[in-house]
Amino acid sequence: LPKLGKLPIHQIKASQTIEVLKPLEEAGKLDMIKRVTQAINQIMTFAVNTGIINTNPLANITKAFESPKKRHQLTLEPKELPALMKALSYANIQLLTRVMIEWQLHTMSRPSETAGARWEEIDLEARLWNIPAERMKMKRPHTIPLSPQTLELLEIIRPHSGESEFLFPSDMKKGQHRNTQTANMALKRMGYGGRLVAHGLRALASTTLNEHEFNPDVIEAALAHTDKNEIRAAYNRAQYLEKRRVMMCWWSNTITSTPNKENVAFIQEN
């Protein structure tokens, strides 16, 4: 922002900053405005905290601009699940990438949570995947009940990644997990570019479960969506675990009982 860069920080006003950013709004770059105003406010907050200025005149500057529209992740309709599983069965992609996509679909986890999954997080005896808070978007630990199908996927990949820290280790960088974009790139190669992204697998699961009238609170708990009420959130995590186990098993059965259910068998044979 050259027009502001030469000004002493105590001379920067909201009106002139808005004027500088208006061309971005006119160009439709609303996400960029959001990022820029956040960065500017971090600087101004630092200046207040260090005594350089008394107040931050730009604190509410984002209200002067149109908010960026929320982008929904590309996903499929439930009726398209059989075709997806068939395409996945015969896709020309690596075995670990194929299972990575299936694991995310079965567990309803986020791409980053799946890509970084560690063997130490898996409790085979309790049939649970315990994801620590630092790996979760909302920085809260999340436990996912594992269906028989997900346990079977673990046995499929164990010979290929059992010696690694990660379920899905990178084949390019030793000691690291696969890129969070690996699944997206594979879906594009499968012909789903512009129709489905890895994060959209969660929406596919959510839509299917809601259509079959599962408890919405149980679905939200499975998706690790935030409940602003801390007590209610803690209660739900404990109370819904067994209900989620039943639901996750139903979801896995739905995935593998589609007319094109050769996916796991194909992986085992190849």
Language-model-derived ranges and their functions:
Residues 137, 148-152, 156-164, 169-175, ...:
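C-terminal secondary-structure termini that scaffold catalytic or DNA-interacting sites
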Residues 13, 32-39, 77, 96-97, ...:
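Hydrophobic (often cysteine-bearing) scaffold residues that line and stabilize catalytic clefts
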